[in-house]
Regions:
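Secretory-pathway luminal glycosyltransferase catalytic domains
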Residues: 1-109
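Donor-binding and catalytic core of enzymes assembling or modifying cell-surface/extracellular glycoconjugates
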Residues: 104-192
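Conserved histidine-centered catalytic loops in small-molecule metabolism enzymes
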Residues: 194-202
Length: 202
């Protein structure tokens, strides 16, 4: 067994708050550990980041065809995060359906809604999603779901990193996110919020 006795140095973010000192003084050729979930980290290289996150050709082709078939070219992405949030609700609370109902009221009512979730079985049971305009993804694949999310012109986010990136990659001007990101055991989310998005109370 070969052991690297001189691993590359690394920097780890202390919290979800943007660290200006780390941003200005981080040396080259280090590994970064953390979420770095704020536009403040990369707004100056936004185009490069978007290019780095472009979908593989096969994924893009499959999702584009799927998106066109189920939506006709326009859709609202509605993301629900449940599984791990149910375990630690004081850190990441599960958002109530009332949040999604209010968010839906802000968008046109004749646009199809793609419901994306880590708990699609639960979504199928909810009366809110029984109308024909709601299409619940049962893909079971995180890449497919995020690709579909990024193609939607309207976004209704959960308090989730996965949701954040899906909405950000869509580059949509019509994004609704919850003001409530963390519970009482969580951190200050101020730098997670993207200024151009709209935020609703929960």
């Amino acid at each position: 067994k070969v052991v690297n006795m001189h691993p590359a140095p690394y920097k780890q973010e202390a919290s979800f708050t943007f660290d200006e000192d780390l941003f200005n003084n981080c040396e080259d050729n280090v590994n970064l550990y953390g979420y770095f979930q704020s536009e403040k980290w990369f707004s100056h290289i936004e185009n490069s980041i978007r290019k780095d996150f472009e979908w593989r050709d096969d994924v893009d082709a499959m999702c584009s065809q799927m998106f066109e078939n189920i939506t006709g070219g326009q859709a609202i992405s509605l993301h629900i995060r449940r599984t791990d949030h149910l375990i630690k609700p004081t850190y990441h609370p599960v958002l109530p359906l009332s949040y999604y109902e209010e968010a839906l009221s802000k968008f046109p009512s004749d646009i199809p809604v793609i419901v994306l979730s880590d708990d699609p079985a639960w979504c199928h049971e909810q009366e809110l999603f029984q109308d024909d305009r709601f299409l619940i993804s049962d893909s079971g694949d995180n890449i497919t779901d995020m690709c579909l999310m990024s193609m939607c012109q309207y976004q209704i986010m959960a308090n989730s990193t996965y949701s954040w990136w899906g909405a950000w990659l869509s580059n949509s001007e019509h994004v609704i996110a919850p003001k409530l990101w963390f519970g009482p055991d969580g951190q200050d989310p101020k730098d997670i919020y993207v200024k151009r998005w709209k935020y609703l109370d929960v």
